[in-house]
Structure formats: structure tokens, C-alpha cells
Curated annotation (Swiss-Prot):
Gene: Klf8
Compartmental location: Nucleus
UniProt short sequence motif 9aaTAD, positions renumbered to this chain: 82-90
Organism (species): Mus musculus
Family: Belongs to the Sp1 C2H2-type zinc-finger protein family.
Pfam families in alphabetical order: zf-C2H2
Listed PROSITE patterns: ZINC_FINGER_C2H2_1 (PS00028), ZINC_FINGER_C2H2_2 (PS50157)
Cross-link (Glycyl lysine isopeptide (Lys-Gly) (interchain with G-Cter in SUMO)): 64
A GO cellular component annotation in the UniProt record: cytosol
Single GO term (MF): DNA binding
Protein name: Krueppel-like factor 8
InterPro entries: Znf_C2H2_sf, Znf_C2H2_type
Length: 355
């Protein structure tokens, strides 16, 4: 028992000796001061760090990097728009409220007062169409001299298509000259098809200067001038004259083209079918004779003794046969000369006209 106690004393002494050697090698162990923990927030000041730069390296492990409280307090009531940078080395950009980041709201433009045009659709219903009073790109300005030399400005509007129920759906755009308020008078028959539309024209003196009647089916404007049309033309209204020419000339051209197209359908129905030839004839016999030019066929042969002439047309053979017989049926009434061909007589008469 005594030996065991002696061994324990030796072991304790050896361990205490080794502990003292370890303390001499490593140095004193630093202890934390409770007052230093309370002043942790003030450890970020440069004076504290400069006083003890690296004496206690263990203290730097307990430093918690945080942004200054004044920065956090200034942003407490503001909504977070972007991620917050908590580093000390980067300057913090000032945050803008969410209301300042929104697009500016433009006030709406005040609506323009439209003009109303009353269009009577039947005996008891009236439909109004709105036309803006401001000048649109489709508006045309024209000036004229009124009574007393006072200039009058005419505005040529284009009435847009008015979406009306049932019978008024066939109306289209109509150019007209307006001075105060244009009126479009429309009469509808009982069968439901829209009739002609009469549009009045207002002159420089404020009186009616004619009217334009438009057929909705063909949309071909026709002009019917009134009694005061001559005075309106004499007053030198350039706007009215240009508008009347615009409505009158296309109507005449369309009317003539319509008659010509009907005439072509009735008469010029025989057309040559050879490539590159566009000849059209009113009779099939003329087309048949024309086709012989392409084929080279000459069925008409001269029967005079010793003559071998052939012709593609019978009138050419008759004209040639007069050379053999000497017959000259075409006689001049001024000089009693005779010719075998009618075209020769026409050339001869021109000489009398020039003398």
C-alpha cells in the first residue's frame, strides 16, 4: 500500500512538472473580461484597434461584423427594393422609395367635342353620327371669296362609314364641302335596298350651289346643279369647281366605259386565236378572212384568160377583175373622172379641197 502511494506521488509530481514546462512554453492563457463583452459594439472604432493591434488574437474571432446602427435606422421605414450590401468597404447607395420607381402617369388628353350629323333612316327614326371638329389628315382646306370680299374657308371632310342597323349598312365614305353642318338626306324604298344619296353643296355666299347624287350600288357620283350653279361658278369658288370636276368627270368616264364594254360584248366577240395576234372582228366572215393571212390560204382565183392571180378575200378579187374589164364605177362629181377603187376617189377629192 505504501508502495502504491509512493508511485502515485511520483506520477503527480511528474505531471505537475510537465504542466509547468507547458505553461512556460505556451505562455499565460488569456481570460475574458465581462466588461469587455459589454463594450463589444464599441470595438469597431479605429482607436481601439490601433491600441492593441495583435496582442490578443483571440479577440478578433469574437468580433461580429455588422452595419452601423444609424444606417439600419434610416432604412427601417422604407421597403427593400434590392439586396442590402452589409460590407464596410463598399459605399451604400441611397435607396429610392417604390413610388419614385414607377413610370410617370400622364394626364389623359381632354376629349374633343364632336359634331353630330343627323341621318334620317325612316319616317320616325333618326340616327346620329359623330365627326370630330379637329382637322384630321384626311381633311382638305380650300379658300374662296364671299360677298364683300371676305375670305371664306371651306373644310372638306370625309364622312366615315356609319355602322347603322339593317338598311343603312350599304353606305360608304362621301367627300363633301361643309361650311357649318353638312346634312346627308337618304331615302329608303320599301324593298330594303338603299336608294341614291343626295349631298348638298354650300357655296361661298352661304346658299346652295348644287347637289351631288350618289348611287350606293355602283358608288358612281353624279352631279345635278341647281339654279344657282351659274352664279356660284361666276363667283370664282375654286373649291367648288375642283369638287364639281372631281364628281363630274369620273361619272362621265365610267358611263362611257360601261357603254363601250357592253358594245364590246355585243359586237367584238370574234378574236383571232393565233399567238401574238390580238385582232378582234365584229363578224365571223372577217375573222375567217383574217386567219388566211396567217395560214397563207388564197381560195379566190382570177378566171381571166392567162391570169393566175389568187386572193384570200372576194372583194380583192372583184377589185382585181376590174383591171381586166376596165370598169370604173367610182366617179368624181366635180371633174367627172372615174376610178376603179373607192380609196382612189377619196384621194382625188382631197385635191379639190386643197385647191
Amino acid at each position: 500500500m505504501d508502495k502504491f502511494i509512493d508511485n502515485m506521488d511520483v506520477r503527480i509530481k511528474s505531471e505537475s512538472g510537465s504542466m509547468q514546462v507547458f505553461k512556460q512554453v505556451t505562455g499565460p492563457v488569456p481570460t475574458r473580461d465581462p466588461s469587455a463583452r459589454a463594450d463589444r459594439r464599441n470595438m469597431t472604432s479605429p482607436s481601439f484597434l490601433a491600441a492593441s493591434p495583435m496582442e490578443n488574437p483571440a479577440l478578433f474571432n469574437d468580433i461580429k461584423i455588422e452595419p452601423p446602427e444609424e444606417l439600419l435606422e434610416s432604412d427601417f421605414n422604407m421597403p427593400q427594393v434590392e439586396p442590402v450590401d452589409l460590407s464596410f468597404h463598399k459605399p451604400k447607395a441611397p435607396l429610392q422609395p417604390a413610388s419614385m420607381l414607377q413610370a410617370p402617369i400622364r394626364p389623359p388628353k381632354p376629349p374633343t367635342a364632336p359634331q353630330a350629323i343627323m341621318v334620317p333612316t325612316s319616317a320616325d327614326t333618326v340616327t346620329s353620327a359623330a365627326i370630330p371638329t379637329v382637322l384630321t389628315p384626311g381633311s382638305i382646306l380650300a379658300s374662296s371669296q364671299g360677298t364683300g370680299g371676305q375670305p371664306i374657308l371651306h373644310v372638306i371632310h370625309t364622312i366615315p362609314s356609319v355602322s347603322l342597323p339593317n338598311k343603312m349598312s350599304g353606305l360608304k365614305t362621301i367627300p363633301l364641302v361643309v361650311q357649318s353642318l353638312p346634312m346627308v338626306y337618304t331615302s329608303l324604298p320599301t324593298d330594303g335596298s338603299p336608294a341614291a344619296i343626295t349631298v348638298p353643296l354650300i357655296g361661298g355666299d352661304g346658299k346652295s350651289a348644287g347637289s351631288v347624287k350618289v348611287d350606293p350600288a355602283s358608288m358612281c357620283p353624279l352631279e345635278f346643279p341647281s339654279d344657282s350653279d351659274e352664279s356660284a361658278i361666276e363667283s370664282g369658288s375654286s373649291a367648288l369647281q375642283s369638287l364639281q370636276g372631281f364628281h363630274h368627270e369620273p361619272a362621265t368616264m365610267v358611263h362611257m366605259q360601261g357603254e363601250e364594254s357592253l358594245d364590246l360584248k355585243r359586237r367584238r366577240i370574234h378574236q383571232c386565236d393565233f399567238a401574238g395576234c390580238s385582232k378582234v372582228y365584229t363578224k365571223s366572215s372577217h375573222l375567217k378572212a383574217h386567219r388566211r393571212i396567217h395560214t397563207g390560204e388564197k381560195p379566190y382565183k382570177c378566171t381571166w384568160d392567162g391570169c393566175s392571180w389568187k386572193f384570200a378575200r372576194s372583194d380583192e378579187l372583184t377589185r382585181h377583175f376590174r383591171k381586166h374589164t376596165g370598169i370604173k364605177p367610182f366617179r368624181c362629181t366635180d371633174c367627172n373622172r372615174s376610178f376603179s377603187r373607192s380609196d382612189h376617189l377619196s384621194l382625188h377629192r382631197r385635191r379639190h379641197d386643197t385647191m
